Design a protein with these regions (language model features):
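Aromatic (phenylalanine/tyrosine) cluster motif
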Residues: 1-2
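C-terminal motif of bacterial Sec signal peptides marking the signal peptidase cleavage site
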Residues: 28-29
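Small/polar-residue-rich segments within soluble enzyme cores
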Residues: 326-328
C-alpha cells in the first residue's frame, strides 16, 4: 500500500528461526562486513520463534506452532497476516522469496516474485518525449507486476506444511485482523501519514487509509490541480498533517472478503473469479497491463540456491532475480 522505507532504514532483514527451519530474506542496502563490529548475540529457544515486522502477525505464527504446526505452517500464517497488519512488508498484491533449510538438511529456494505482464513493452516507462518517467515506473498501473504472494504461500503450505491445517485455518488470523480491526504499530502510523498524498488519488484507499478527510486536504488538492502550489510543496504539506497514531484501529471489510475467497477457493479465489475480475477491471480503467491470462498462468518457481562462503561458513542464498547473489 505504500512504498518501502528501505531508503531510510538502509538495511532490512527479516529472520524466522525455528527448530527445523531457518528462513531469511535480506534486502539490498547491506554494508561491507568490515564496516561492522563483531557482536556475539546468542538467542536460544527449544520450541521455536517467529520474527516479523508485526507483533500480531508473529503471534499468528506462534499460535500455529503451539497447535502442532511446523515452521512452514507458521510462515504462511504470518505471511498472510502481514498482508493486513504490515502491508509495506508483506502483501498479496506483491511477491517474495523463501530461503529455507529443513531438518533433513534440504535447502529450498522458492521464487514467487511478481512477473511482467504479457502486454509489457520496452518503452512503457518513457514519457511522451522519450524520457524515463519515475512516476510511470513506480506509481502507475503499468508498473504493477503479476502478483505472486498468494501462489507462493499456498505452494509452501502444500509442499512443506505439516498437513494438520487447512488453508482456511491458516488464513483465519488475517481474516480476523481485517474484518474486526487491528491496532496499527508506530511504523504503519508513520507510513499512512507519509504517503497520504498517494492514498488520496484513489477513492477506495481514501475511505480506509485517510483517517479524516479535512477541508484543508481538499483545498491542498485543489491548489495543486490549479497549479497554485508546486507538487512537492503539496506533498510536504500533506505529510505534515499528522493523523495516525500507534494503536489506532483500522477495519478493512473488503480486504476480509478478498481473503475469504482465497480461504474458500485457494488459488482460484485470487487468480480467477471475482478478485481477478476486480484486478483486471482496475487495470483496464487505468492503462494497466495485467490480464486474466497473466493471472491464470502465474506459477511459483523452485530455483537452485547459490552458495558462498563467509568466515569459514557456507552461506546459501536465493539466486536471481533476487539480490542474494550480489549479497554473497
Amino acid at each position: 500500500y505504500f512504498e518501502s522505507l528501505e531508503n531510510q532504514i538502509g538495511e532490512k532483514i527479516i529472520l524466522l528461526n525455528i527448530a527445523d527451519l531457518l528462513i531469511s530474506i535480506s534486502l539490498i542496502g547491506c554494508k561491507p562486513g568490515s564496516d561492522y563490529s563483531s557482536t556475539n548475540l546468542k538467542i536460544e529457544n527449544r520450541n521455536g520463534a517467529v520474527s516479523s515486522t508485526s507483533r500480531l502477525a508473529s503471534e499468528a505464527g506462534v499460535d500455529i506452532m503451539k497447535k502442532g504446526g511446523n515452521a512452514f505452517d507458521a510462515i504462511v500464517a504470518t505471511g498472510f497476516a502481514l498482508a493486513v497488519t504490515s502491508p509495506s512488508n508483506g502483501n498479496i498484491g506483491g511477491g517474495g522469496f523463501m530461503v529455507a533449510r529443513t531438518n533433513q538438511g534440504e535447502v529450498i529456494t522458492l521464487d514467487f516474485r511478481e512477473k511482467a505482464p504479457t502486454l509489457s513493452y520496452e518503452t512503457m516507462f518513457l514519457d511522451d518525449e522519450g524520457n524515463y518517467s519515475r512516476n510511470l515506473a513506480l506509481l502507475s498501473h503499468k508498473s504493477s507486476g503479476v502478483p505472486g504472494t498468494v501462489d507462493g504461500l499456498i505452494t509452501i503450505l502444500e509442499d512443506y506444511g505439516s498437513g494438520k491445517f487447512s488453508l482456511s485455518e491458516i488464513l483465519s488470523y488475517a481474516i480476523n485482523f481485517a474484518e474486526n480491526g487491528h491496532g496499527i504499530n508506530k511504523s504503519s502510523a508513520f507510513g499512512l501519514d507519509f504517503y497520504k498524498h498517494l492514498f488520496l488519488e484513489d477513492k477506495g484507499s481514501t475511505k480506509i487509509f485517510i483517517k479524516d478527510y479535512t477541508l484543508e486536504m481538499k483545498q491542498l488538492q485543489q491548489d495543486v490541480l490549479n497549479g497554485t502550489i508546486p507538487e512537492q510543496e503539496y506533498i510536504d504539506k500533506m505529510r505534515s498533517l499528522d493523523q495516525w497514531n500507534e494503536g489506532d484501529i483500522i477495519i478493512q471489510k473488503d480486504w476480509a472478503e478478498t481473503l475469504k475467497r482465497i480461504s474458500e477457493n485457494g488459488r482460484d479465489g485470487f487468480y480467477s473469479g471475482k478478485t481477478a475480475n476486480l484486478i483486471v477491471n482496475e487495470m483496464r480503467a487505468n492503462n494497466g497491463l495485467i490480464s486474466h491470462e497473466d493471472l491464470k498462468q502465474y506459477r511459483s518457481i523452485y530455483r537452485e540456491p547459490i552458495l558462498g562462503n563467509y568466515r569459514g561458513y557456507k552461506v546459501r542464498s536465493m539466486g536471481p532475480p533476487s539480490s542474494g547473489g550480489p549479497l554473497i
